A protein has these predicted regions:
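Basic, polyanion-binding surface patches
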Residues: 1-190
Length: 190
């Protein structure tokens, strides 16, 4: 029997990321797990309006999304616990300016530089609509075709209902394989 859990947001886990922003020569970092794909070249970064980083993103119209692995988790969690309005977080991560002009964390295994094209505001959140301009990955986390290999990347995942971090799991199978097998078994009647 299923139980009604009320209006619980249960689309988790999500990748843990650190958003980088720069405004007036100052870099700030913020742990953000509410990042989602909304098109083949677009993503949305959803940040509570109380965050100091939001105004920096609004000013520059650019941000970086840095994937978090276990080696950087303590510092990534830290930049989500303290406000950039009160704490200078610029030196928490060694970083460089990426080709798109955003601060990129050196040790992040994969980072995306983004141009902010829109902001969909709700009562409490800025939802930045972003166009990915550059994706930068360490060579040791890519496959032989140069695409990200998440078994090598091992991104940290965030689970909101349990308020915890998770490790990524094993590959179950290639996408579309189960559906094609099912179609063959049912003679494609569905």
């Amino acid at each position: 029997m299923k139980k009604d859990m009320g209006p619980l947001l249960a689309l988790y886990p999500m990748p843990a990321t650190v958003v980088g922003a720069e405004s007036n020569g100052k870099v700030n970092w913020l742990m953000v797990a509410h990042v989602g794909i909304i098109g083949h070249d677009r993503l949305m970064v959803s940040m509570h309006k109380a965050h100091h980083t939001n105004q920096m993103v609004k000013d520059s119209r650019r941000l970086s999304v840095n994937m978090v692995d276990e080696g950087m988790l303590r510092r990534a969690d830290y930049v989500g616990c303290v406000s950039g309005a009160k704490t200078d977080k610029q030196g928490v991560f060694a970083h460089h300016t990426g080709p798109g002009g955003t601060p990129v964390i050196d040790e992040s295994p994969l980072a995306m530089e983004c141009e902010v094209t829109d902001n969909y505001e709700t009562d409490t959140f800025d939802n930045f609509i972003c166009r990915v301009t550059h994706t930068i990955a360490d060579e040791n986390v890519t496959d032989d075709k140069g695409k990200p290999d998440y078994n090598r990347l091992k991104p940290v995942l965030f689970n909101m209902p349990g308020y915890s971090y998770l490790r990524t799991g094993d590959v179950i199978c290639r996408c579309t394989l189960p559906g094609r097998e099912y179609a063959r078994e049912t003679d494609g009647d569905n």
